[in-house]
Amino acid sequence: MDLSKYPAEPFKIKSVEPVKMISREEREIAMKEAGYNTFNLRSEDVYIDLLTDSGTNAMSDAQWAGMMIGDEAYAGSKNWLFLESTIKELFGFKHVVPTHQGRGAENLLSSIAIKPGQYVAGNMYFTTTRYHQEKNGGIFVDIIRDEAHDASIDIPFKGNIDVNKLEKLIEEKGAENIAYVCLAVTVNLAGGQPVSMANMRAVRELTAKHGIKVFYDATRCVENAYFIKEQEEGYADVSIKDIVHEMFSYSDGATMSGKKDGIVNIGGFLAINDEELFGKAKEIVVVYEGMPSYGGMTGRDMQAIAIGFREAMQYEYIEHRIRQVRYLGDRLKEAGVPIVEPVGGHAVFLDARRFCPHLDQEQFPAQSLAASLYIDSGVRSMERGIVSAGRDVNTGENHKPKLETVRLTIPRRVYTYKHMDVVAESVIHLYKHKEDIRPLKFTYEPAQLRFFTAKFDYAD
């Protein structure tokens, strides 16, 4: 292994959790009982869990030490003051509202910033984000660059907004009818693709001319900053911390799930500069999350997430993080497995369209591929395609995204390169026998965010 290309873990392992591989017969039974939905599996039946990087991270000794000084006062916790000051320092925002996770922040922002019938422009949808926008009367418009919808195109900063699309939307709908621009850094469903600093700057310049606010989905902003440092001219010698600070200088606020780049198990926030919107958010957070000084988090969790934000911006940490994901992607590409290119920040996305060419999108190829991967090796992954996209709120028809993928999401500081080898070998084996992957049909379809709890069975 080339250690300059794939650096060793920049940490020592102090505590371990045993895992076991149950038999193939047991995995087949578990998958059937789960309705061929990996979300419904019991974690004890999973060998390597790549369902998500959200809240599945390993905390550091410093974070665990911080947990011991949790101030669990109902109001005015010292841990909240530490978290608030950390967010203001690192991200540069004037005001912060804590939430139990990113979804809580999405709910707050959508509630205070969208009027029914207004448009929300963004660089590709995300499941829960679009749900909250539509729930509050918003209409999502995808303005990501066209290349992001093609898994095979390998170009940098594939998550960029197409500024011409944004300008056209403003001309057609009117600036007053656009609630805000939602800029995700990175873009999850495009494959964890980053946004360039130049693009953030261009979006800011255009929206400022029209008085339109820009809010970031900051969930994996540190990963985005690494790509800027690695690939964008003028940033090679700039620290991750300074890159992050500049990124958010081109925004009016951000929602964030701290369960990713905060390297913790729970927590999030809404950060905002506008005084009036901040006041509204503080009123609503009491209803949905808790007091504005904890937002659904314990004091110990707030201490841990503040420490985690600082650790995430250490170069050695984020370099290993990105390179470990890239290692898995490189192994699959070398074997000819079709994936979303380039490899993004938090996951490797299998291109289920090319992986399962014998299945129509309405036969749920990504869902079936994820189920097959678990049966083959005990590796849990996540469908990110037509099932996740859901149905059109007006027509009831399935949204049909151009990308039909299976996400292999790498938790932070949890698995080693050897685990990545196990995953790669299983995926490669499946690809050699891809014709055995069978079509699925719904047996239970929830009305909202169906991918979480839906159940399926084989359709043939």
UniProtKB/Swiss-Prot annotation:
Keyword Cytoplasm in annotation: no
Names of required cofactors: pyridoxal 5'-phosphate
Keyword Cytoplasm: no
Spans traversing the lipid bilayer: none
Modified residues (N6-(pyridoxal phosphate)lysine): 260
Disulfide bonds: none
GO BP: tyrosine metabolic process
Catalytic activity line of the entry: L-tyrosine + H2O = phenol + pyruvate + NH4(+)
Quaternary assembly: Homotetramer.
Record's protein name: Tyrosine phenol-lyase
Organism of this sequence: Clostridium tetani (strain Massachusetts / E88)
Lineage of the organism: Bacteria, Bacillati, Bacillota, Clostridia, Eubacteriales
